[in-house]
Curated annotation (Swiss-Prot):
Pathway: Amino-acid biosynthesis; L-histidine biosynthesis; L-histidine from 5-phospho-alpha-D-ribose 1-diphosphate: step 6/9. It comes from the Bacteria. This is Imidazoleglycerol-phosphate dehydratase. One of its GO terms (cellular component) is cytoplasm. InterPro entries: IGPD_sf (IPR038494), ImidazoleglycerolP_deHydtase (IPR000807), ImidazoleglycerP_deHydtase_CS (IPR020565), Ribosomal_Su5_D2-typ_SF (IPR020568). It holds the Pfam family IGPD. Keywords: Amino-acid biosynthesis, Cytoplasm, Histidine biosynthesis, Lyase. It comes from Streptomyces avermitilis (strain ATCC 31267 / DSM 46492 / JCM 5070 / NBRC 14893 / NCIMB 12804 / NRRL 8165 / MA-4680). Its EC number is 4.2.1.19. It is found in: Cytoplasm. It catalyses: D-erythro-1-(imidazol-4-yl)glycerol 3-phosphate = 3-(imidazol-4-yl)-2-oxopropyl phosphate + H2O.
Length: 197
């Protein structure tokens, strides 16, 4: 059974198309107009082994906020759609990823209950190119709200802002991959004692 999610979201601020195949091979085609964000979404697809298409046109003449936020909302909704009934998945996933001096620890529960815990070093550089580093948390908040997952992201240390953000996306990719993969020992079983996720 195909596990593909496709979401189109159009407002006066943005036009977004996201398609994700959870059982892909890491093929990525991303264009948001925000170079560093494209780079992070590329990490998400490649390290999650998700086939990921993202096409966003936004009001970048103002700034990148709406473009980044609406893309994350659509991505979360597409991920939830692709998960389907969640029967037979592992449900939980975690991964720790270093990037030189930075380290990210990510744990996810595909629980149906949106919750985010996010910590990263203070006093990060405010910008990476056109990317506002305060948007990383907002991306995760937006994704979690629509995907309806519990997500814990912890960066205990790091100096370079690029590395701090990138290791979060890489660890998130792997954690989502592990949680969403099918468990051969649990075929046909919903991973919940209450019978619903």
């Amino acid at each position: 059974m195909s596990r593909v999610g496709r979401v189109e979201r159009t407002t006066k601020e943005t036009s977004v198309l996201v398609e994700i195949d959870l059982d892909g091979s890491g093929k990525v085609d991303v264009s948001t107009g925000v170079g560093f964000y494209d780079h992070m979404l590329d990490q998400l697809g490649r390290h999650g082994l998700f086939d990921l298409t993202v096409k966003t046109e936004g009001d970048l003449h103002i700034d990148s906020h709406h473009t980044i936020e609406d893309t994350a909302l659509a991505l979360g909704a597409a991920f939830k759609q692709a998960l389907g009934d969640k029967v037979g998945i592992y449900r939980f996933g975690n991964c720790t990823v270093p990037l030189d001096e930075s380290l990210a620890q990510v744990t996810v529960d595909l629980s149906g209950r949106p919750y985010l815990v996010h910590t990263e070093p203070e006093n990060m550089a405010p910008m990476i190119g056109e990317y506002d580093t305060t948007m990383t948390r907002h991306i995760l908040e937006s994704f979690v709200a629509q995907a309806q997952i519990a997500l814990h992201v912890h960066v205990p240390y790091g100096r370079n802002a690029h590395h701090i953000v990138e290791c979060q996306f890489k660890a998130l990719a792997r954690a989502l991959r592990y949680a969403s993969e099918r468990d051969p020992r649990a075929a046909g079983i919903l991973p919940s004692t209450k019978g619903a996720l």
